Regions:
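N-terminal leader/targeting segments and the immediate start of mature chains
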Residues: 13-48, 52-57, 82, 184-198
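Gly/Pro-enriched, hydrophobic low-complexity segments
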Residues: 115-190
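An acidic-aromatic
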Residues: 48-97, 161-164
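Short solvent-exposed loop/turn micro-motifs enriched in small/polar/acidic residues
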Residues: 51-53, 60-61, 105, 110, ...
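Bacterial N-terminal signal peptides
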Residues: 2-11
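Flexible, surface-exposed loop/linker segments and immediately adjacent secondary-structure boundaries
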Residues: 89-122
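Short, exposed beta-strand/loop patches in secreted or surface proteins that constitute
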Residues: 32, 48-53, 66-67, 111-119
Length: 198
């Protein structure tokens, strides 16, 4: 009878171990992402570009669209239309623009589990699954993290189909990023039409 109970509880014990391992991997990844001098990540996949990150501040450039966020205000510049929108984005809006914010809020916004070790982009690492706690219930975010706790890739699936995928092609820490890099500089875009949505 005791053996039967132990077998019945086994999936819950494994799940608890996976959650502990996921927490360990994600926390160590956040330490890397939170470097006081900032990081630069170049990426490809559904979109190509690069991201500068320092705490919650970021600058994202994917060619046609550039976004600056200084921790309060966001500026989004569209090269095709020469328009810049200014807003105070919600946490959900920020996560859709800057995928690293998903990792920064994993404990509050997601249920998470450790999937296992794997090789991705030629590097050995970990796979962690994130599922939103509310809304977007069919969405699954797969995060691939290297053995040195640097993000390798992120994939968003919904109902068995891939919505987006980002592969990190270069990841550099200790970038000495100045705070001014996270604010739109109108003098560099003199023809831009400013649309203030705040």
């Amino acid at each position: 009878l005791l053996t039967l109970w132990m077998l019945a509880l086994l999936p819950y014990c494994i799940s608890a171990q996976n959650d502990a391992k996921a927490t360990e991997v994600l926390d160590k990844t956040l330490e890397v992402l939170s470097g006081e001098n900032g990081i630069r990540a170049d990426f490809g996949g559904t979109e190509n570009g690069f991201l500068l990150l320092k705490g919650e501040k970021f600058y994202l450039n994917n060619g046609n669209i550039q976004s600056w966020y200084d921790g309060e205000t966001q500026w989004s510049y569209v090269a095709d239309t020469e328009e810049v929108n200014i807003s105070h984005p919600t946490p959900e809006e920020l996560q859709s623009i800057n995928p690293y914010l998903i990792l920064m809020r994993y404990k509050t916004d997601f249920n998470y589990s450790y999937k296992g070790e794997l090789t991705r982009n030629g590097a050995k690492g970990h796979e962690v699954i994130l599922k939103p706690k509310r809304g977007r219930s069919a969405e699954i975010i797969r995060v691939f993290i290297s053995k040195t706790y640097q993000p390798l890739a992120m994939k968003v699936d919904q109902n068995g189909k891939t919505l987006s995928e980002i592969n990190i092609t270069s990841f550099r820490t200790d970038q000495h990023l100045e705070d001014g890099m996270f604010r739109f500089n109108k003098s560099l875009y003199p023809n831009a039409e400013v649309i203030d949505l705040r």
